């Protein structure tokens, strides 16, 4: 549960307790959390003080990130670092259409980052996202181009020079959805704002997004919308129909955090 460690920790505790209760008759069984403290991303290993923590050294400098990035760019990992069964699975997956789509996405990300190699500093991007809800529905768009081509996303984008965050959010909302709700009504429906800044939330690089929550007045019909600009289409989706694998980057978690679904 990105952006809500308490929920994630609770889920892990409950899952471990369920397994322990089935396989151990001891009142106080010993539970060990075994992992490698690689960097800041390993902070979760410190979230369970009730269990014994066992730190292990890195094994032969293996890391999943370069293996995964290389594979998505068409390179098979060396067979001496993976079990043969895993190698077979990865080779078979390369023949599927979904792999080719992932490879094109990885190439786009690689080229995107290379375009910033000449910058004197590693860039930090600032974006905005509109979380618009009405009558149990969320307003989404289908992305027209990479990254995330074909995925559902919140209306949003980069902040232009000389505009405030809220103005950027409303501009992107109108450009991508053609939402006809008057601007004064949008301002009156603004229920919250939150920064989402997980360092790894975007494959493009360090991207900090400011999400604005608009809770429109309930009605028997939803406002008409139409995809525009970077959006192939715009539509209303019941909140109960959200599927994390269909949403771009961390937008599923942003929606859950902003709407109180956690």
Task: Give residue ranges: language-model regions.
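Nucleotidyltransferase catalytic core that binds NTPs
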Residues: 1-111
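Short catalytic/ligand-binding loop motif for oxyanion handling, primarily in non-cytosolic enzymes
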Residues: 40-44, 62-64, 147-150, 202-204, ...
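Nudix hydrolase/Nudix homology domain
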Residues: 73-107, 149, 205, 209-262
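Active-site segment of metal-dependent pyrophosphate-handling enzymes
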Residues: 133, 170, 178-222
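Short histidine-centered catalytic/ligand-binding loop motif
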Residues: 152-163
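Hydrophobic alpha-helical positions that pack around
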Residues: 155, 169, 173
């Amino acid at each position: 549960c990105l952006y809500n460690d308490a929920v994630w920790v609770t889920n892990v505790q409950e899952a471990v307790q369920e397994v322990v209760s089935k396989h151990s008759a001891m009142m106080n069984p010993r539970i060990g959390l075994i992992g490698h403290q690689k960097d800041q991303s390993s902070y979760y290993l410190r979230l369970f003080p009730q269990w014994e923590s066992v730190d292990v050294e890195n094994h032969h400098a293996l890391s999943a990130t370069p293996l995964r990035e290389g594979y998505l760019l068409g390179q098979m990992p060396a067979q001496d670092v993976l079990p043969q069964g895993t190698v077979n699975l990865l080779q078979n997956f390369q023949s599927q259409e979904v792999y080719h789509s992932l490879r094109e996405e990885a190439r786009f990300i690689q080229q995107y980052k290379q375009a910033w190699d000449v910058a004197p500093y590693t860039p930090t991007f600032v974006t905005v996202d509109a979380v618009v809800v009405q009558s149990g529905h969320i307003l989404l768009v289908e992305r027209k181009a990479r990254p995330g081509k074909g995925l559902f996303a919140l209306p949003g984008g980069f902040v232009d020079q000389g505009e405030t965050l809220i103005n950027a959010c409303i501009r992107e909302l109108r450009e991508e959805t053609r939402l006809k709700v008057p601007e004064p009504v949008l301002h009156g429906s603004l229920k919250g704002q939150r920064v989402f800044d997980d360092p790894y939330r975007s494959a493009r690089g360090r991207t900090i997004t400011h999400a604005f929550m608009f809770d429109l007045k309930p009605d028997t019909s939803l406002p008409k919308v139409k995809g525009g600009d970077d959006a192939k289409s715009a539509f209303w989706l019941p909140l109960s129909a959200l599927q994390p694998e269909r949403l771009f980057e961390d937008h599923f978690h942003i929606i859950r955090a902003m709407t109180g679904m956690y």
